[in-house]
Amino acid sequence: MGGFVASTAAADSDISVVAGVDKINNGEKFPIFSSFGDINVKADMIIDFSHPSMLEPMLEYAVKNNIPVVIATTGYDNSQTEKIRATAKKIPIFFTFNMSLGINLVAALAKKAAKVLGD
């Protein structure tokens, strides 16, 4: 999903990706840092499509730098969801579920099936 965000941003002159956080650098046209603590560039927002294990350092970085966050990662447990809610009182957070086309297609089909099949 990060690749999709990067390619979409590259096609829009009003948007730029200034950095990424990943263990692997696939030769992106922007710096890739191995942790949030290594980031040395300024960003206007964070778009998170990572893994629940990255939540804590990402939120700490966002609060420390007063950066709004879009969170579109799935698999959070109840304590992590509560952490997101608590952090949203400090910085703007948009928290949604997986935004991939596949999962949204499945969700739409499930809604249609529920209407047709009923209870």
Question: Which residues fall in each region the model found?
Answer:
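N-terminal Rossmann-fold NAD(P) dinucleotide-binding loop
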Residues: 2-3
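Hydrophobic beta-strand scaffold residues
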Residues: 17, 32, 69-70, 93-95
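Short amphipathic alpha-helix with an adjacent loop that forms part of the alpha/beta core around
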Residues: 33-42
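N-terminal Rossmann-like NAD(P) cofactor-binding module of classical short-chain dehydrogenase/reductase
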Residues: 46-47, 71
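Rossmann-fold NAD(P)-binding glycine/threonine-rich loop
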Residues: 53-65, 72-114
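Short, structured loop/turn "capping" segments at alpha-beta junctions
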Residues: 116-119
